[in-house]
Protein backbone atom coordinates (compact mmCIF):
# COMPACT_ATOMS: atom_id res chain seq x y z
CA UNK A 1 0.00 0.00 0.00
CA UNK A 2 2.81 2.39 0.81
CA UNK A 3 4.27 1.67 -2.64
CA UNK A 4 0.96 2.48 -4.31
CA UNK A 5 0.69 5.79 -2.46
CA UNK A 6 4.19 6.85 -3.53
CA UNK A 7 3.79 8.57 -6.93
CA UNK A 8 7.51 8.61 -7.60
CA UNK A 9 7.78 4.86 -7.06
CA UNK A 10 4.77 4.20 -9.29
CA UNK A 11 6.20 6.39 -12.04
CA UNK A 12 9.57 4.63 -11.82
CA UNK A 13 7.86 1.22 -11.93
CA UNK A 14 5.90 2.17 -15.05
CA UNK A 15 9.05 3.45 -16.78
CA UNK A 16 10.96 0.25 -15.93
CA UNK A 17 8.03 -1.87 -17.17
CA UNK A 18 7.94 0.06 -20.45
CA UNK A 19 11.70 -0.33 -20.88
CA UNK A 20 11.42 -4.06 -20.23
CA UNK A 21 8.61 -4.39 -22.76
CA UNK A 22 10.56 -2.34 -25.32
CA UNK A 23 13.76 -4.35 -24.81
CA UNK A 24 12.02 -7.72 -24.96
CA UNK A 25 9.29 -7.22 -27.58
CA UNK A 26 10.82 -4.90 -30.21
CA UNK A 27 13.75 -7.19 -31.19
CA UNK A 28 11.23 -9.99 -31.70
CA UNK A 29 8.69 -8.10 -33.82
CA UNK A 30 11.32 -6.21 -35.84
CA UNK A 31 13.49 -9.27 -36.49
CA UNK A 32 13.66 -9.90 -40.25
CA UNK A 33 16.09 -10.86 -43.00
CA UNK A 34 17.55 -7.35 -42.95
CA UNK A 35 18.09 -6.84 -39.21
CA UNK A 36 19.57 -10.29 -38.67
CA UNK A 37 22.17 -9.88 -41.44
CA UNK A 38 24.55 -7.99 -39.19
CA UNK A 39 27.64 -8.43 -41.37
CA UNK A 40 25.89 -7.63 -44.65
CA UNK A 41 27.83 -4.94 -46.52
CA UNK A 42 24.68 -4.07 -48.48
CA UNK A 43 23.65 -2.20 -45.31
CA UNK A 44 25.97 0.62 -46.34
CA UNK A 45 23.80 1.38 -49.37
CA UNK A 46 20.83 2.19 -47.14
CA UNK A 47 22.47 4.52 -44.61
CA UNK A 48 20.85 7.60 -43.04
CA UNK A 49 17.30 6.78 -44.14
CA UNK A 50 14.69 8.87 -42.35
CA UNK A 51 11.93 7.47 -40.10
CA UNK A 52 9.04 6.10 -42.13
CA UNK A 53 5.64 4.62 -41.28
CA UNK A 54 2.73 3.89 -43.61
CA UNK A 55 0.35 4.35 -40.68
CA UNK A 56 1.61 7.83 -39.81
CA UNK A 57 2.71 9.07 -43.23
CA UNK A 58 -0.13 11.62 -43.10
CA UNK A 59 1.66 13.28 -40.18
CA UNK A 60 4.94 13.70 -42.08
CA UNK A 61 6.44 10.39 -40.91
CA UNK A 62 7.08 9.45 -44.51
CA UNK A 63 10.85 9.12 -44.82
CA UNK A 64 11.15 12.50 -46.54
CA UNK A 65 12.37 15.97 -45.63
CA UNK A 66 12.29 19.47 -47.04
CA UNK A 67 15.35 20.55 -49.03
CA UNK A 68 16.44 23.38 -51.29
CA UNK A 69 18.02 22.00 -54.45
CA UNK A 70 19.42 23.48 -57.65
CA UNK A 71 17.69 23.22 -61.00
CA UNK A 72 20.38 20.72 -62.07
CA UNK A 73 19.59 18.46 -59.12
CA UNK A 74 15.88 18.81 -59.82
CA UNK A 75 16.46 17.66 -63.41
CA UNK A 76 18.63 14.81 -62.07
CA UNK A 77 15.77 13.56 -59.89
CA UNK A 78 13.32 13.91 -62.77
CA UNK A 79 15.59 11.77 -64.96
CA UNK A 80 15.66 9.11 -62.24
CA UNK A 81 11.85 9.06 -62.31
CA UNK A 82 11.83 8.76 -66.10
CA UNK A 83 13.88 5.56 -65.92
CA UNK A 84 12.48 3.95 -62.76
CA UNK A 85 8.95 5.33 -62.53
CA UNK A 86 9.63 6.38 -58.92
CA UNK A 87 9.85 10.06 -58.02
CA UNK A 88 12.25 11.07 -55.25
CA UNK A 89 10.49 14.45 -55.03
CA UNK A 90 7.19 14.04 -53.21
CA UNK A 91 6.19 17.71 -53.08
CA UNK A 92 7.26 21.03 -54.60
CA UNK A 93 6.87 24.04 -52.31
CA UNK A 94 8.50 26.66 -54.52
CA UNK A 95 9.74 26.18 -58.07
CA UNK A 96 12.44 27.65 -60.28
CA UNK A 97 13.29 30.79 -58.32
CA UNK A 98 16.46 32.85 -58.07
CA UNK A 99 18.36 33.30 -54.82
CA UNK A 100 20.09 36.67 -54.56
CA UNK A 101 22.39 35.37 -51.81
CA UNK A 102 23.74 32.57 -54.02
CA UNK A 103 26.83 32.97 -56.20
CA UNK A 104 25.48 30.31 -58.57
CA UNK A 105 23.69 31.17 -61.80
CA UNK A 106 21.31 28.29 -61.15
CA UNK A 107 17.71 28.65 -60.08
CA UNK A 108 16.41 26.72 -57.09
CA UNK A 109 13.54 24.54 -55.93
CA UNK A 110 12.14 24.07 -52.43
CA UNK A 111 11.01 20.44 -52.41
CA UNK A 112 10.31 17.46 -50.19
CA UNK A 113 12.72 14.62 -51.01
CA UNK A 114 12.10 10.95 -50.18
CA UNK A 115 15.30 9.59 -48.58
CA UNK A 116 14.43 6.05 -49.74
CA UNK A 117 13.70 6.82 -53.39
CA UNK A 118 16.59 9.27 -53.82
CA UNK A 119 19.10 6.39 -53.61
CA UNK A 120 17.98 5.35 -57.07
CA UNK A 121 20.28 2.79 -58.65
CA UNK A 122 23.14 0.76 -57.17
CA UNK A 123 26.26 -0.59 -58.87
CA UNK A 124 26.78 -4.24 -57.93
CA UNK A 125 29.14 -7.02 -58.95
CA UNK A 126 27.44 -10.43 -59.00
CA UNK A 127 28.44 -14.02 -59.46
CA UNK A 128 26.81 -16.09 -62.19
CA UNK A 129 24.50 -17.73 -59.64
CA UNK A 130 23.45 -14.37 -58.17
CA UNK A 131 22.86 -12.93 -61.63
CA UNK A 132 20.62 -15.85 -62.58
CA UNK A 133 18.78 -15.79 -59.24
CA UNK A 134 17.75 -12.16 -59.68
CA UNK A 135 16.51 -12.85 -63.20
CA UNK A 136 14.42 -15.77 -61.95
CA UNK A 137 12.96 -13.58 -59.19
CA UNK A 138 12.12 -10.87 -61.75
CA UNK A 139 10.24 -13.37 -63.90
CA UNK A 140 8.36 -14.77 -60.92
CA UNK A 141 7.36 -11.40 -59.43
CA UNK A 142 7.28 -9.27 -62.59
CA UNK A 143 9.36 -6.57 -60.88
CA UNK A 144 12.34 -5.00 -62.65
CA UNK A 145 15.51 -5.20 -60.54
CA UNK A 146 18.33 -5.13 -63.11
CA UNK A 147 18.43 -2.17 -65.49
CA UNK A 148 20.53 -1.76 -68.64
CA UNK A 149 24.22 -1.01 -68.24
CA UNK A 150 25.44 2.35 -69.52
CA UNK A 151 28.30 3.46 -71.72
CA UNK A 152 30.22 5.35 -69.03
CA UNK A 153 32.89 6.38 -71.55
CA UNK A 154 30.38 8.74 -73.16
CA UNK A 155 30.06 10.69 -69.88
CA UNK A 156 32.46 13.62 -70.09
CA UNK A 157 32.74 14.40 -66.36
CA UNK A 158 35.00 11.72 -64.76
CA UNK A 159 33.34 12.13 -61.36
CA UNK A 160 29.96 11.12 -62.83
CA UNK A 161 31.08 7.94 -64.60
CA UNK A 162 30.55 5.81 -61.50
CA UNK A 163 27.15 7.34 -60.70
CA UNK A 164 24.61 4.54 -61.33
CA UNK A 165 21.79 7.07 -61.79
CA UNK A 166 23.35 8.60 -64.91
CA UNK A 167 21.82 6.71 -67.84
CA UNK A 168 21.67 9.64 -70.26
CA UNK A 169 23.76 12.27 -71.99
CA UNK A 170 24.41 14.83 -69.30
CA UNK A 171 26.09 18.09 -68.40
CA UNK A 172 29.09 18.23 -66.10
CA UNK A 173 26.64 18.75 -63.22
CA UNK A 174 24.60 15.63 -63.98
CA UNK A 175 21.58 17.30 -65.55
CA UNK A 176 20.23 15.68 -68.74
CA UNK A 177 21.13 17.12 -72.14
CA UNK A 178 17.85 17.18 -74.06
CA UNK A 179 17.55 16.59 -77.79
CA UNK A 180 15.79 18.99 -80.16
CA UNK A 181 12.42 17.51 -79.17
CA UNK A 182 13.10 17.99 -75.47
CA UNK A 183 13.70 14.31 -74.74
CA UNK A 184 16.42 12.62 -72.68
CA UNK A 185 18.97 10.69 -74.75
CA UNK A 186 19.85 7.28 -73.24
CA UNK A 187 23.42 5.98 -73.27
CA UNK A 188 22.61 2.32 -72.65
CA UNK A 189 25.13 -0.25 -73.83
CA UNK A 190 24.10 -2.09 -76.99
CA UNK A 191 27.34 -3.96 -77.64
CA UNK A 192 29.27 -6.61 -75.75
CA UNK A 193 28.24 -9.67 -73.77
CA UNK A 194 25.83 -9.50 -70.85
CA UNK A 195 25.84 -13.15 -69.82
CA UNK A 196 22.83 -14.08 -71.95
CA UNK A 197 20.33 -11.94 -70.05
CA UNK A 198 16.91 -13.56 -70.48
CA UNK A 199 14.56 -11.78 -68.08
CA UNK A 200 12.40 -8.63 -67.95
CA UNK A 201 13.39 -5.70 -70.12
CA UNK A 202 12.55 -2.05 -69.61
CA UNK A 203 10.00 -0.24 -71.76
CA UNK A 204 11.46 0.86 -75.08
CA UNK A 205 14.07 -1.90 -75.21
CA UNK A 206 14.00 -3.57 -78.62
CA UNK A 207 16.23 -6.35 -77.35
CA UNK A 208 19.52 -4.60 -78.05
CA UNK A 209 20.24 -3.26 -74.54
CA UNK A 210 22.89 -5.02 -72.48
CA UNK A 211 22.03 -5.61 -68.81
CA UNK A 212 25.51 -6.41 -67.51
CA UNK A 213 29.18 -6.09 -68.33
CA UNK A 214 31.03 -9.36 -67.97
CA UNK A 215 34.51 -9.55 -66.45
CA UNK A 216 36.82 -12.38 -65.45
CA UNK A 217 37.53 -15.74 -67.06
CA UNK A 218 34.98 -18.28 -68.22
CA UNK A 219 35.70 -20.28 -65.07
CA UNK A 220 34.92 -17.38 -62.73
CA UNK A 221 32.88 -14.70 -64.43
CA UNK A 222 31.62 -11.59 -62.66
CA UNK A 223 28.69 -9.47 -63.76
CA UNK A 224 28.66 -5.73 -63.15
CA UNK A 225 25.06 -4.54 -63.07
CA UNK A 226 22.84 -1.59 -62.20
CA UNK A 227 19.98 -2.48 -59.89
CA UNK A 228 17.07 -0.47 -58.55
CA UNK A 229 17.70 0.03 -54.82
CA UNK A 230 14.06 -0.42 -53.78
CA UNK A 231 13.26 -3.53 -55.82
CA UNK A 232 16.68 -5.04 -55.01
CA UNK A 233 15.90 -4.60 -51.32
CA UNK A 234 12.63 -6.50 -51.85
CA UNK A 235 14.46 -9.26 -53.69
CA UNK A 236 17.23 -9.60 -51.11
CA UNK A 237 15.26 -9.20 -47.88
CA UNK A 238 11.68 -10.09 -48.81
CA UNK A 239 9.97 -6.81 -47.84
CA UNK A 240 9.87 -3.09 -48.61
CA UNK A 241 12.52 -0.86 -47.03
CA UNK A 242 10.57 0.87 -44.25
CA UNK A 243 12.26 1.78 -40.97
CA UNK A 244 10.16 3.24 -38.16
CA UNK A 245 13.09 5.17 -36.66
CA UNK A 246 15.19 5.26 -39.84
CA UNK A 247 18.73 3.90 -40.21
CA UNK A 248 22.12 5.06 -38.97
CA UNK A 249 25.16 5.92 -41.12
CA UNK A 250 25.93 2.19 -41.49
CA UNK A 251 22.42 1.34 -42.67
CA UNK A 252 21.43 -0.40 -39.43
CA UNK A 253 17.83 -0.20 -38.23
CA UNK A 254 17.85 2.34 -35.38
CA UNK A 255 14.75 0.93 -33.66
CA UNK A 256 16.26 -2.56 -33.44
CA UNK A 257 19.63 -1.21 -32.33
CA UNK A 258 18.00 0.82 -29.55
CA UNK A 259 16.02 -2.18 -28.33
CA UNK A 260 19.08 -4.43 -28.38
CA UNK A 261 21.03 -1.76 -26.48
CA UNK A 262 18.26 -1.46 -23.89
CA UNK A 263 18.16 -5.22 -23.48
CA UNK A 264 21.92 -5.36 -22.93
CA UNK A 265 21.75 -2.50 -20.40
CA UNK A 266 19.00 -4.20 -18.41
CA UNK A 267 20.81 -7.53 -18.47
CA UNK A 268 24.05 -5.85 -17.42
CA UNK A 269 22.23 -4.06 -14.57
CA UNK A 270 20.79 -7.37 -13.33
CA UNK A 271 24.22 -9.02 -13.40
CA UNK A 272 25.81 -6.13 -11.49
CA UNK A 273 22.98 -6.20 -8.94
CA UNK A 274 23.43 -9.95 -8.47
CA UNK A 275 27.18 -9.52 -7.97
CA UNK A 276 26.62 -6.72 -5.45
CA UNK A 277 24.07 -8.85 -3.60
CA UNK A 278 26.44 -11.81 -3.46
CA UNK A 279 29.37 -9.69 -2.26
CA UNK A 280 27.15 -7.95 0.30
CA UNK A 281 25.80 -11.24 1.63
CA UNK A 282 29.28 -12.74 2.03
CA UNK A 283 30.68 -9.57 3.58
CA UNK A 284 27.74 -9.26 5.96
CA UNK A 285 28.03 -12.88 7.02
CA UNK A 286 31.74 -12.45 7.76
CA UNK A 287 31.12 -9.24 9.72
CA UNK A 288 28.34 -10.89 11.69
CA UNK A 289 30.41 -13.96 12.48
CA UNK A 290 33.36 -11.98 13.83
What are these model-predicted stretches?
Residues 11, 254-286:
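Transmembrane alpha-helix signature in integral membrane proteins
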Residues 2, 20-23, 256, 264:
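Conserved beta-strand->loop/alpha-helix structural units within folded catalytic cores of enzymes
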Amino acid sequence: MRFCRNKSSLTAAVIIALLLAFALIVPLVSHNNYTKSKTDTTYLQYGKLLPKSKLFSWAGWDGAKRETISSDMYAYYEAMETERGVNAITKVYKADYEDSSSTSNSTFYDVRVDSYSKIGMLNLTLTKAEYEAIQDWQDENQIQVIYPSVDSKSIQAPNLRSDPNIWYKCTNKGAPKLDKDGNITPIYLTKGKDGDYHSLRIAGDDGSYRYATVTGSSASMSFKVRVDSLSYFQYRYGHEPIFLFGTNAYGQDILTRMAEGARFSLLFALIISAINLAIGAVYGAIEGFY
